[in-house]
């Protein structure tokens, strides 16, 4: 990312996971990794904060902040309901069902979970700003716990974000364009999955063991985590 204008430096409405990082070293490491196209492309915390600054709508901002604070795949984030969150201090967390597990579960008629397969993972929510803003969004937008399915007539758990992957990509594109208008650019293309890669790298910078990160990311194989 290029230099940030003064308003970004002083903005406090953008989320940063509370971890101290040697940013000059982190920038140098990322510059080296960009030589290899096959390695994950990610943003550093100040860049994520800058991007969120250009998302004025609280509902949109909190979806992107959820991707950043949890490392969720976009399908996982869009499936979240209020019941998946426990925001009670001192240890708030979110329960995520991994993408592949959700797909397999929908395809099984017997509803049995394959032996040894964990269907959900718990991800701690360490950013108090994020937790507070999520509570504000739920209260302000009056997001219900359940709603009636107009097609089936059944009462179902209400998803927090009733949008599609394409819509989220549009939101991100609009934020990137707004940032560019202020002279703020990003070193990598930004997609929903960029936030997942960014979360993983941020956790590694914080000293999280690889096996723990594997669990947080919902990787079945450690080899998937080792790409970071």
Stretch-by-stretch model annotation:
Residues 67-90, 211-212:
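Short, charged phosphate-coordinating catalytic segments
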Residues 20-49, 104-128:
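DNA breakage-rejoining catalytic core of tyrosine-based enzymes
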Residues 126-186:
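Active-site/catalytic core of tyrosine-dependent DNA strand-transfer enzymes
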Residues 45-74:
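Basic, Lys/Arg- and aromatic-enriched nucleic-acid-binding interface segment
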Residues 79-136:
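Conserved tyrosine-mediated DNA breakage-rejoining catalytic core shared by Y-recombinases
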Residues 85-89, 189, 208-228:
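Short, polar N-cap/turn motifs at the start of nucleic acid-interacting alpha helices
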Residues 165-168, 186-206:
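Short basic/aromatic active-site micro-motif
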Residues 1-28, 73-75, 174:
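N-terminal DNA-binding recognition helix of tyrosine site-specific recombinases/integrases
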């Amino acid at each position: 990312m290029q230099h940030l204008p003064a308003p970004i430096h002083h903005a406090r409405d953008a989320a940063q996971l509370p971890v101290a990082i040697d940013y000059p070293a982190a920038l140098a490491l990322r510059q080296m990794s960009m030589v290899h196209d096959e390695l994950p492309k990610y943003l550093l915390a100040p860049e994520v904060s800058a991007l969120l600054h250009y998302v004025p709508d609280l509902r949109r901002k909190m979806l992107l902040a959820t991707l950043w604070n949890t490392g969720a795949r976009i399908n996982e984030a869009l499936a979240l309901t209020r019941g998946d969150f426990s925001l009670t201090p001192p240890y708030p967390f979110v329960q995520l069902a991994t993408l592949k597990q959700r797909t397999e579960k929908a395809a099984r008629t017997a509803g049995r979970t394959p032996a040894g397969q964990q269907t959900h993972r718990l991800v701690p929510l360490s950013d108090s700003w994020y937790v507070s803003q999520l509570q504000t969004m739920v209260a302000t937008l009056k997001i219900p716990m359940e709603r009636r399915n107009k097609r089936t007539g059944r009462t179902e758990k209400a998803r927090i974000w009733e949008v599609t992957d394409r819509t989220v990509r549009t939101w991100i594109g609009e934020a990137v364009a707004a940032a560019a208008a202020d002279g703020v650019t990003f070193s990598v293309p930004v997609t929903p999955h960029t936030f997942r890669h960014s979360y993983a790298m941020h956790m590694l910078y914080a000293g999280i063991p690889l096996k723990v990160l594997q669990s947080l990311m919902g990787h079945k194989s450690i080899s998937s985590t080792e790409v970071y």
